[in-house]
Amino acid sequence: MSERCKENAVGHIVQVIGPVIDVAFSRGQVPEIMEAIVVDANNLTIEVQAQLGDGVARGIAMGPSEGLKRGLAVTRTGAPISVPVGHATLGRIMNVLGEPVDGKGPVQTEDRQAIHRPAPAFDELAASTEVLETGIKVIDLVCPFAKGGKVGLFGGAGVGKTVLMMELIRNIAIEHTGYSVFAGVGERTREGNDFYHEMTDSGVLDKVALVYGQMNEPPGNRLRAGLTGLTMAEHFRDEGRDILMFIDNIFRYPLAGTEVSALLGRMPSAVGYQPTLAEEMGQLQERITSTKVGSITSVQAVYVPADDLTDPSPATTFAHLDATVVLSRQIAELGIYPALDPLDSFSRQLDPQIVGQEHYDVARSCQKTLQRYKELQDIIAILGMDELSEDDKLLVSRARKIQRYLSQPFFVAEVFTGSPGTYVSLKETIRAFKAIVAGEYDHLPEQAFYMVGTIDEALAKAQKLQQG
């Protein structure tokens, strides 16, 4: 900030309506849009959203506005909100301003970056079609993740969304020596607390930075929490790392934007959303990308209001996704975890030119077998297995083996299941499913394929079953 700006950089509050604060400055010192200004009395940060004329700036409070009154002094910072970045953020829980909320003292770093920055330039982007191996069989087979891609995670309560996220964080941390950033956007405080303790127990907390804009916080906090997490992820990417970024829940990002838009008096658009919905979503999503230096792969939990996929918020999100992972309650009820639906889930990466002809053929063969089994289930329920043709009986047997082999014991769930977790390479996954579809394991019982990692484990389990 210039010396002239420092001299007259103090204004005073002229109006407070909930989280919307109007501040008057001298005419030559009106803060810029997106600049952070600070209330001297309680150190509350306000982000400027509009200039109303006559030296008055309107902003959104990044914290509770209780206790504010007209006349309080407000100081310009001359810059947008900035947050700590780098290794010091790992293992810490921070709020939207990058302030620690875990009681472990300040974040020990001098490195800070502004949360508002442009997306990487076109010539900086990497046109990579590389697949990110997760070690989770069902994901690697039917909906492979692209390095630097965006994945939508659809799932209701209790189907294993959080456990799947934690396993991905663990696998990236251990197998790829990578870091993760978790942004809780409009997150329930209880969920955030559970997530923190579960990751501590799993031993991966030191590989992840957590940013929470909790559900009970003002809309400004929830609107910017995603950008705070993304800024931390971008720093790691620019160091040459492959980063995994989780956003839970991406739906609450435009929802917070809707609240801010209404508070600022903007004309609502379809279904009451802000008129700038697509632009705001684009500003966040376009920054989540691969450059020639490193990559950010994001997994975003998507809530679909009233299961209406045409709602403007999920519809806008869909435009940015490379893959959709659908967690199904019906599959969870069968005791198959991860409860990922291999017929509903989709990835743009599942293309023979990207993953190779063999991977593509094996994945499609598995889906074809499962689809036929789904069609036959009504007949089986009414008439029983005996009424099926020999070919269909064989197909059903293979489909049930595929379905069970898609389950996998997780490292982060070892505490609950008592089974050691497994990381299965993509090569091993393709080899195993190819053999099951080809009928090489028709002689084995289907129980042998349930909750095992590699096919060798299934063979060993089958031997135990025969002996016992």
UniProtKB/Swiss-Prot annotation:
Catalytic activity entry: ATP + H2O + 4 H(+)(in) = ADP + phosphate + 5 H(+)(out)
EC number: 7.1.2.2
Function description: Produces ATP from ADP in the presence of a proton gradient across the membrane. The catalytic sites are hosted primarily by the beta subunits.
Gene Ontology CC terms, in alphabetical order: plasma membrane; proton-transporting ATP synthase complex
Gene Ontology MF annotations: ATP binding; ATP hydrolysis activity; proton-transporting ATP synthase activity, rotational mechanism
Similarity remark: Belongs to the ATPase alpha/beta chains family.
UniProt subunit comment: F-type ATPases have 2 components, CF(1) - the catalytic core - and CF(0) - the membrane proton channel. CF(1) has five subunits: alpha(3), beta(3), gamma(1), delta(1), epsilon(1). CF(0) has three main subunits: a(1), b(2) and c(9-12). The alpha and beta chains form an alternating ring which encloses part of the gamma chain. CF(1) is attached to CF(0) by a central stalk formed by the gamma and epsilon chains, while a peripheral stalk is formed by the delta and b chains.
Pfam families per UniProt: ATP-synt_ab, ATP-synt_ab_N, ATP-synt_VA_C
Binding-site list for ATP: G155, G156, A157, G158, V159, G160, K161, T162
Membrane topology of the entry: Peripheral membrane protein
Keywords in alphabetical order: ATP synthesis, ATP-binding, Cell inner membrane, Cell membrane, CF(1), Hydrogen ion transport, Ion transport, Membrane, Nucleotide-binding, Translocase, Transport
InterPro entries: AAA+_ATPase (IPR003593), ATP-synt_VA_C (IPR055190), ATP_synth_F1_bsu (IPR005722), ATPase_a/bsu_AS (IPR020003), ATPase_alpha/beta_chains (IPR050053), ATPase_F1/V1/A1_a/bsu_N (IPR004100), ATPase_F1/V1/A1_a/bsu_N_sf (IPR036121), ATPase_F1/V1/A1_a/bsu_nucl-bd (IPR000194)
Subcellular location, record wording: Cell inner membrane
Gene3D superfamilies from the UniProt entry: 2.40.10.170, Bovine Mitochondrial F1-atpase, Atp Synthase Beta Chain, Chain D, domain 3, P-loop containing nucleotide triphosphate hydrolases
Main location: membrane
Name under which the protein is recorded: ATP synthase subunit beta
